[in-house]
Design a protein with these regions (language model features):
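Positively charged n-region of N-terminal signal peptides that target proteins for export
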Residues: 1-6
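Bacterial N-terminal signal peptides
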Residues: 7-16
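Extracytoplasmic substrate-binding proteins
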Residues: 25, 35, 106, 116-194, ...
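Short helix-initiation/N-cap motifs at beta->coil->alpha
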Residues: 31-33, 86-97, 113, 218-227
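Short helices/loops that flank or line small-molecule/ion binding pockets
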Residues: 95-103, 125, 225-234
Length: 337
């Protein structure tokens, strides 16, 4: 009973706030191609994805975040600035009551998750639902620019500086592998034998690295296959994505080793060229997609082209951690702090 009353009170408060908060707004296009009306200036944001939080941090607008998911809260080492923010539950199944109580201007969600219930529950409260995946390397620049456009001119300038930095490193990586023989590759998501296809961040990464991805004909972002399917295609390299994220080096190493062993021990996989040549690689999903995909691109290129002088993924990650693009932002901003 108390829970129902609490939800009702939050609903009334949010609807009252929405009624009186009518003012300027901007219209942006989300990842579904929809026109979304956003009240401006945006002061309060709930993000249902960790990649959304990372993008907002790049823009230096962490001050706008008022709620995050339980998953993001568990990653305190990666997101210390937001660890104390309220949890709104799981990214795919958020707590609408908590969101209503937080009264955000905008909730940032994936393209298709959660489902339409998100709009049905929140839009009547005056909460805009902005669906931006912010994961796929090919779409990330446009999506980040959309997000920056609602967070203000400084966020937009920092976003442009960030992509200048990404472009410089991408050019160096691609120059380093130019002319190298292209290996064949298959990439697997978290679920065993769930193969990454066109449109997925992991597939995009292999394409950016210039590999010949043997799943280019499946026509969908991911497909469940069996071992026979992989054995028939017989890739020279096999990439397995894993979710680490705890930032405990010893634990991450243990889990990476376990993951590699589980792949190598699959029935008949000793027949694969990738296994014979010790070319099975485990890639942390945090650097395989989202705003840090550049690090994953460098790591993947180094694996696929061992004879090339590929820029160090570690160095790129260090620059990312130190916001190395900020001098470009200040330069573009006329040197102002």
């Amino acid at each position: 009973m108390n829970r129902i009353l609490g939800w009702f009170a939050a609903l009334v408060l949010a609807m009252f706030s929405a009624t009186w908060a009518q003012g300027p707004e901007t219209v942006v296009t989300d990842s579904l191609g929809r026109s979304v009306h956003i009240p401006v200036p945006v002061r309060r944001v709930v993000s249902l994805s960790a990649s959304g939080v990372e993008c907002i941090r790049i823009m230096e607008r962490i001050d706008t975040l008022v709620g995050i998911t339980e998953h993001t809260k568990t990653r305190k080492a990666q997101f210390p600035e937001v660890a104390r923010l309220p949890s709104v539950g799981r990214g795919f199944m958020p707590n609408f009551e908590v969101i209503a109580e937080l009264r955000p201007d905008v909730i940032l969600a994936w393209k298709t998750n959660p489902g339409p219930e998100l709009e049905r529950q929140l839009e009547p409260l005056g909460i805009a639902v902005l669906r931006l995946d912010l994961t796929e390397p090919g779409k990330l620049p446009e999506e980040m620019r959309t997000l920056a456009s609602i967070l203000g001119p400084e966020a937009q300038k920092r976003t442009e500086a960030y992509w200048e930095w990404v472009a410089r490193w991408t050019e160096q990586i691609q120059k380093s592998i130019a002319g190298q023989p292209k290996p064949t590759v298959l990439a697997e998501h978290f679920t065993p034998l769930r193969i990454a296809g066109p449109g997925s961040g992991l597939y995009d990464l292999t394409q950016m690295a210039g590999a010949n991805n043997l799943a280019d004909d499946i026509g969908i972002r991911s497909m469940q296959v069996d071992s026979e399917w992989v054995l028939e295609r017989n890739p020279q390299c096999f990439v397995k994505s894993i979710l680490l994220g705890k930032r405990n080096a010893e634990e991450d190493t243990r889990r990476t080793d376990e993951c590699l062993r589980s792949v190598l021990e699959r029935d008949n996989w000793q027949l694969l060229d990738a296994v014979k040549e010790n070319r099975v690689y485990i890639l942390d999903s945090d650097i395989a997609s989202g705003p840090r995909y550049l690090v994953g691109l460098a790591e993947l290129a180094a694996w696929l082209y061992p004879d090339a002088s590929v820029p160090s993924g570690k160095r790129i990650h260090e620059e990312w951690a130190n916001a190395a693009w900020m001098p470009m932002y200040k330069e573009n901003d006329g040197g102002q702090d």
